[in-house]
Amino acid sequence: ESRADASIEKFDDNNSGFFALVHAFREASKLRDLANLYTVLDRDHRYYIGSKTGRITAYADEDPTDSRSKIIKQAEFQFPEEVTGPVMGLSMTYDGWLIAATEHGYVVAMSRDLLEYHTIRLQHSEGAEAKATKPTGYGWIRNGFAIDEEGGIYIASQQHMHKVVWTGDGLSTSTTDGAWTAEYLNGWGHGTGATPSLMGFGNEDAFVVITDGEPQMNMVLFWRDEIPADWEQLP
């Protein structure tokens, strides 16, 4: 905390010019292991961060009763060897499992103590390791994701919208569990730049919404659950 305060004070004193840029670069370099900006803080004040190498780290207060106590590394989990790609998003299910998605199309569910885990790979992700369209931030998965209260996990890949289902004891991409995959327009080739958003709750029509990959983007709504029998698809 004292180092953070000192850095902020230095920016307050001088926030322009060459030396300010050097200071900003040095401070930003402390975050070089982060894979993305999507992190999670749980109800017990554990802070979870994902790395470029598939490592999840949990930080917490040294004294759980004192929020001003020293922050310590509480737990760490390295993805198994077969799960590849930088961590592109972190979130949590309504029953308290931490969910991560990697750039190469893997989804990992972890207990909050990082001792148990389940993995699955998204459909259409074959060869995702070689499908990045630019050096940074344009991989097969490049955004965060959304989770609904029924365990639906909504992930946008380079050309598809995916619903993965957390069943309570595992991850599923099977339609029998309510999972699905749908293609969207991708004229510019890089895929959507949007994090999926949930729309409709309670008795309302339930959708997941993204912008597509067209040069002039369209807003696209996907039915989250079973499509009504009387719905007429747009041409």
Question: Could you describe each region identified by the protein language model?
Answer:
Residues 98, 102, 112-116, 124, ...:
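Glycine- and small hydrophobic-enriched segments that form the cores of compact globular domains
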Residues 1-76:
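Post-signal peptide N-terminal segment of secreted/secretory-pathway proteins
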Residues 3-5, 53-64, 104-112, 158-167, ...:
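Structural motif
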Residues 1, 45-51, 95-102, 108, ...:
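Short beta-strand elements that form the blades of beta-propeller/WD-repeat-like
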